Design a protein with these regions (language model features):
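Loop/turn positions that initiate beta-strands
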Residues: 9-10, 80-86, 221-222
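Boundary regions of SH3-family modules and the immediately adjacent low-complexity/disordered segments
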Residues: 1-2, 11-13, 18, 25-60, ...
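Catalytic cysteine-centered active-site loop
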Residues: 163-177, 181-219
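Residue-level "contact hotspot" at macromolecular interaction interfaces
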Residues: 5-6, 79, 215-218
Length: 280
């Protein structure tokens, strides 16, 4: 999405044709503009059937090649990044599974690079779209503890990635892109930008003006820390993971809120605005 966001292969959008550029509305409620030639037109019925079938999988590795055959020597047809959606077919061989892409291409991907998709496109056709995001729950059968553990594990997979404004991919990602992708990969759609937005599940559990010592009392692994124009994920023991465009870092790393820790960032510790949680 021009200058603001990144939409991946296999993701659904609603769109309105405005010529060379089209206005799109994503399945997570974000609006923007895309070039017309980047869209593969599908019907609403196609989207609903895909959701109902339940065989959409998401790429979990930084990158995964789609191969003509089920072997490493086969010809590469496409390279997909973390977050791309594919339709998983029944055919498996040598640790590979056959997948079908939204553009009709079919090939093989290592099964280890995929996981069942947990989020939903229902916002795009639901009757109560204004309530859709706040009424989401964590994946069925998951405990709060499991969800928190999974989002932290997923977030750590972005450590070392370079910073890219508006990015959400393993080859370049911004601060809100990291936390958005981590929650999406674990079945919960949050607001894409670095703030808490009404109508989404993230709610404030601490605000600027309260005692700083309460941050560590209230925040748990997987909760989010918000600054003005910046966001990170709380881990434990005062540490947080974030992707920063700071000239000395320019990427995804871990820092601390605790003065005296080697990775303490005084500027961020003193400027914290809000702590948010989907379990508030």
């Amino acid at each position: 999405i021009r200058d603001r966001d990144e939409v991946f292969f296999g993701w659904s959008v609603m769109w309105e044709d405005k010529g060379e550029w089209i206005e799109v509305w994503t399945h997570y409620g974000y609006r923007g503009w895309m070039e017309r030639n980047l869209i593969e037109e599908k019907s609403r019925e196609w989207m609903e059937e895909r959701e109902k079938a339940g065989n959409t999988y998401v790429v979990t590795r930084g990158f995964a090649d789609v191969m003509r055959g089920a072997r490493v020597q086969a010809r590469m047809l496409e390279t997909l990044g973390r977050g791309c959606f594919v339709e998983k077919m029944e055919e498996t061989e040598n640790g590979y599974c056959r997948v079908k892409l939204a553009n009709g291409i079919s090939g093989f991907v290592p099964e280890a690079a995929l996981r069942k998709r947990l989020d939903s496109d229902r916002f795009l056709w639901g009757k109560s779209e204004e309530r859709f995001f706040v009424e989401q729950g964590i994946p069925e059968g998951w405990s709060e503890e499991k969800f928190r553990r999974k989002v932290v594990e997923c977030a750590k997979g972005y450590l070392g990635c370079q910073y890219r404004w508006g990015g959400k991919a393993a080859d370049g990602i911004d601060c809100s892109g990291v936390v958005f992708m981590v929650y999406l990969m674990n079945g919960v759609l949050i607001w894409r930008d670095a703030d808490i937005r009404e109508g989404y599940p993230m709610k404030a559990i601490w605000r600027e003006g309260e005692e700083m010592c309460l941050v560590e009392e209230r925040a748990k692994a997987g909760d989010l820390l918000f600054w003005r124009g910046h966001v990170g994920m709380y881990l434990e023991d005062g540490r947080y993971l974030h992707c920063t465009g700071h000239e000395k870092v320019f990427g995804c790393r871990v820092n601390s809120l605790r003065r005296g820790d080697e990775d303490f960032r005084e500027d961020l510790a003193e400027a914290l605005k809000v702590v948010g949680s989907v379990f508030s």
